A protein has these predicted regions:
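Signature of N6-adenine DNA methyltransferases within the class I
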Residues: 1, 5, 11, 139-142, ...
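Class I S-adenosyl-L-methionine
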Residues: 1-174, 182, 211, 215-216, ...
Length: 337
């Protein structure tokens, strides 16, 4: 059974069990409780099952027979009815995996000569700081977790994988999202990985609820991200920023144009242009940013500030245009990274 079928079947079964009439579950909180209870039973050595007899696995390889974290991400779209309106489009797993690998490889190449020793690479990966400015349900934060652990496992074969998972969760990955409901899913996925790796107590929260474009004293840049920025910034910025045009969103753009980010704004712009500029500002010297975005920015007059910043403040390592390939089923237009 394909992952999509597992997701659809679980939705149908869960709704039926919860409501008796196929209706929607009352809240994401209820589903989270069911999943966490299942995880805790498994940790205690008991067989835990989800409504409808489904298994719950933290391993994405089990997606053909179980509900996995990526299936939970797909469920998010069913719970958040305003996802399209907010510009949120959830990223397919194959793209997340590829982007995570490309970003880490590009960063390592810029930091270390080739050939490089395993000890040097392991040391760098142990200290890397990664940021997703629009976490959503945690596709990229989980993708980076898996990729960093896989690479470090090859370089440090004597280190138990659970130790590597806990180290990456505690030290390497940060994220921000303005949507509290979406962030709850991302935090839950981190919490599952933490517990499955033998983590004790609460995991330090590096996934922050807030507006990535809020530069005020009460915003995330002056609060949860301030220590990293004081130390020079992030090594990697990765993600899928919200695609929101000016049409029908005048208040949102007017507020942005009156903020400290006004220099990144222009007419006929898209919201993600400013996200990209802020992401570049968050990078440490020698850092790498990898975003998936609509490809029209290369010729759109409204993206002039972004193009100028790219040319003056940094360099382009790679552009990958997907052409007519529909990366996102629910989003119009062509995309690139």
């Amino acid at each position: 059974m394909k992952e999509r079928n597992v997701q659809d079947c679980f939705i149908a079964q869960y709704f039926s069990v919860e409501k008796g009439n196929g209706g929607r579950p009352e809240t994401w909180e209820r589903l989270k409780e069911v999943l966490m209870d299942n995880l805790q039973k498994r940790q205690a050595g008991h067989e835990g099952r989800l409504p409808g007899g489904f298994a719950f696995s933290l391993r994405e390889e089990d997606a053909c027979r179980a509900v996995t974290p990526s299936v939970l991400e797909g469920l998010l779209g069913r719970f958040l009815t305003d996802a399209r309106r907010s510009g949120t489009v959830y990223t397919p797993g194959f793209l997340v995996r590829w982007m995570a690998r490309e970003a880490i490889s590009s960063w390592l190449e810029s930091r270390l000569p080739s050939p490089r020793s395993g000890d040097e690479e392991a040391g760098l990966l142990g200290s890397i700081r990664v940021l997703d400015l629009s976490v959503g349900a945690g596709a990229f934060t989980m993708g980076m977790l898996r990729e960093l652990v896989a690479r470090r496992k090859l370089l440090e074969p004597d280190c138990p994988e659970p130790d590597l998972i806990r180290a990456v969760l505690e030290e390497n990955i940060y994220g921000v999202d303005v949507c509290a409901e979406a962030l709850e899913v991302a935090r839950f996925r981190f919490r599952c990985a933490w517990l499955a790796a033998g983590g004790k107590g609460d995991l330090r929260d590096r996934l922050l609820c807030g507006d990535s474009l809020d530069m005020s004293a009460s915003g995330v840049w002056r609060q949860g991200l301030s220590t990293v920025m004081e130390e020079g910034g992030f090594d990697l910025v990765i993600g899928n920023p919200p695609f929101v045009g000016e049409k029908g969103n005048k208040e949102l753009f007017d507020r942005l144009k009156c903020s400290s980010l006004a220099s990144y704004c222009s007419s006929r712009m898209d919201y993600w242009y400013v996200f990209a500029c802020v992401g570049l500002d968050a990078l440490k010297r020698g850092g790498v940013m990898h975003l998936v975005v609509p490809n029209k920015w290369m010729s759109n007059a409204g993206a002039a500030s972004l193009r100028r910043k790219l040319l003056e403040d940094c360099g382009l390592l790679r552009l990958s245009d997907f052409g007519a390939c529909r990366v996102f089923e629910s989003a119009r237009g062509h995309t690139m990274t």
